[in-house]
């Protein structure tokens, strides 16, 4: 039986994620108290459900501290467990709450919205540290739906490498495990014919391939990830997010992510995300 537990900050997209899972055949339970996770999951298994998704977050704050133990209990039952945490930058959450005019679940007469967000972030800290994380700050609803569909299509029990390109001027992705800076390399942006293209286009690829510094940095990053990947696998990680950043996130970082993905796909499960191209 596969169980996906979705957690994260209010406004981060948990409802969208749960809807995608329901549309793909998962039996979904929203706002489940953590202390009921084992009992509900066992009951659903006995009822014939093989794929279940539950949302557990700060709305059930009285029992959140029990979640790590309940996940361990499920693993002892030989269930395939995935904990997914949706993270989002505070300024993005402020904008989303302003647009929807919804109340934060921790709001009261004494706390401002930014204070509620930080309280929730701290409340979920342990879950955040245990989970596979995705930064939804710059993801549209359609991009998040696509990411969730990719996530559930992965082979269970294997570590997945997520290579992500980004632009430093838009901030480092919150879900990064490794971050590499390629801003020191020649920038296709300053070539008039290459500027409107991306790192996926043949002309940009030829430009980058022809530079010895580019190839040397690629080999250094490839070797570093290759050398340390077994350590993350032994640590029972389900996900390893490798983020590659350049200035704008459209040329150099995209080129590196595509090239690294091609190399590692041969022996690993690989996902690719280009944050600025999908924004």
Swiss-Prot record:
UniProt keywords, alphabetically: ATP-binding, GTP-binding, Nucleotide-binding
Residues that hold GTP according to the record: 57-60
Highest taxon, organism lineage: Bacteria
One Pfam family here: PapZ_C
SUPFAM superfamilies, A to Z: P-loop containing nucleoside triphosphate hydrolases
Residues where ATP binds: 8-15
Keyword Protease on entry: no
Molecular function via GO: ATP binding; GTP binding
Record-stated family: Belongs to the RapZ-like family.
Biological function: Displays ATPase and GTPase activities.
PANTHER family found in the cross-reference section: RNASE ADAPTER PROTEIN RAPZ
Protein name: Nucleotide-binding protein Nmul_A0081
Protein source organism: Nitrosospira multiformis (strain ATCC 25196 / NCIMB 11849 / C 71)
């Amino acid at each position: 039986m596969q169980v996906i537990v979705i957690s994260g900050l209010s406004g981060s997209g948990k409802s969208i994620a749960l809807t995608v899972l329901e549309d793909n055949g998962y039996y979904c339970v929203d706002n489940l108290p953590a202390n009921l996770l084992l009992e509900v999951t066992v009951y659903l298994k006995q009822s014939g459900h093989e794929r279940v998704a539950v949302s557990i977050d700060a709305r059930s704050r009285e029992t959140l501290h029990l979640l790590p133990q309940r996940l361990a209990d499920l693993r002892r039952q030989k269930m395939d467990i995935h904990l997914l945490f949706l993270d989002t930058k505070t300024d993005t959450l402020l904008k989303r709450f302003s647009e929807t005019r919804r109340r934060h679940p921790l709001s009261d007469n004494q706390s401002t919205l930014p204070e509620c967000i930080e309280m929730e972030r701290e409340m979920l800290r342990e879950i955040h540290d245990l989970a596979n994380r995705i930064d939804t700050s710059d993801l549209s609803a359609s991009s998040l739906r696509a990411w969730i569909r990719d996530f559930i299509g992965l082979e269970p029990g294997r570590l997945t490498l997520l290579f992500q390109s980004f632009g430093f001027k838009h901030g480092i992705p919150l879900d990064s495990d490794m971050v590499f800076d390629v801003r020191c390399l020649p920038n296709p942006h300053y070539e008039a014919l290459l500027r409107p293209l991306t790192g996926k286009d043949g002309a940009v690829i030829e430009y980058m391939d022809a530079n010895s510094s580019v190839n040397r940095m690629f080999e250094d990053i490839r070797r570093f990830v290759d050398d340390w990947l077994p350590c993350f696998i032994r640590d029972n990680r389900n996900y390893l997010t490798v983020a590659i950043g350049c200035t704008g996130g459209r040329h150099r970082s995209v080129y590196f992510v595509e090239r690294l993905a091609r190399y590692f796909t041969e022996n690993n499960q690989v996902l690719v995300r280009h944050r600025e191209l999908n924004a």
